[in-house]
Amino acid sequence: MSMDADELTIEVSDAETGELVLKQLDKEVLTKGAWQSMMFLYQDRDAKTGEFGEPKVSLRRYQKSQGTFKARSKFNISGKAQAEAIIATLKKWYNI
C-alpha cells in the first residue's frame, strides 16, 4: 500500500495507557519527491504534571521507498529563543 505525505505524523501515544505523550499541532510539507522535507509543530506532555508544554518545532527528512516513507533525519527546535536565533541568522544570510 502506497503512503502519502499527508499521512505522516509525529504523534506518539503511551503503549500501555494509550495516552497522547507527543501532540502534533500542525505540519508543513517543505519539499516533495523521493526525499520529503517536513516541518511539524508539536507539544510534549510533561510526565510529572500531565500538562502539555510550550510548542516546539521538528524539521524532518523522509525517504520514500517502495511506497512508504522512512524517517532519515530530524532536528528539533526546542523553543522560542532558539527559533528566534535561527530566524535572525537566516534573515542575515539571505538579506531579508
Where on the chain are the PLM-derived regions?
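Positively charged, low-complexity terminal tracts
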Residues: 1-84, 88-96
